Amino acid sequence: MVPRVWSLMRFLIKGSVAGGAIYLVYDQDPLGPSDKSQAALQKAEEVVPPAVYQFSQYVCEQTGLKIPQLPAPPKFNFHIRDYWNSGVIKVMSALSVAPSKAREYSKEGWEYLKERTK
């Protein structure tokens, strides 16, 4: 009976975390335009550190453990819109030149093999 209850609790916790993440993405729209993403990042920078501190204080009170002070989160000094989709652009450019590069490398390899077998 206990393993069933424990597995149900794990499922409910995982489902709650996943549902919360989906709701957060829907509500804050961090995958939308860059100005909304920047606003969501700034809001997270303001809200998350106090929440983590408050939770750690609660855990300390309940368990009697001492949790060391966490270092301050790093500050990002760049705008998201400058780097928005830069990874996608790099991957697509690499994929677009992949056939010609593969042909070039295979030609070089073939020439190398011809030279070595003579």
UniProtKB/Swiss-Prot annotation:
Its main location: mitochondrion. The chain crosses the membrane at residues 8-26. Keywords: Membrane, Mitochondrion, Mitochondrion inner membrane, Transmembrane, Transmembrane helix. It is a single-pass membrane protein. Residues 1-7 are mitochondrial matrix. InterPro entries: Mic13. It is found in: Mitochondrion inner membrane. GO terms for biological process: cristae formation. The keyword RNA-binding does not apply. The keyword Transmembrane applies. It comes from the Eukaryota. One of its GO terms (cellular component) is mitochondrial crista junction. Component of the MICOS complex, a large protein complex of the mitochondrial inner membrane that plays crucial roles in the maintenance of crista junctions, inner membrane architecture, and formation of contact sites to the outer membrane. Constituent of mature MICOS complex, it is required for the formation of cristae junction (CJ) and maintenance of cristae morphology. Required for the incorporation of MICOS10/MIC10 into the MICOS complex. Belongs to the MICOS complex subunit Mic13 family. Component of the mitochondrial contact site and cristae organizing system (MICOS) complex, composed of at least MICOS10/MIC10, CHCHD3/MIC19, CHCHD6/MIC25, APOO/MIC26, MICOS13/MIC13, APOOL/MIC27 and IMMT/MIC60. The MICOS complex associates with mitochondrial outer membrane proteins SAMM50, MTX1 and MTX2 (together described as components of the mitochondrial outer membrane sorting assembly machinery (SAM) complex) and DNAJC11, mitochondrial inner membrane protein TMEM11 and with HSPA9. This is MICOS complex subunit MIC13. It comes from Sus scrofa (Pig). The lineage of its organism: Eukaryota, Metazoa, Chordata, Craniata, Vertebrata.
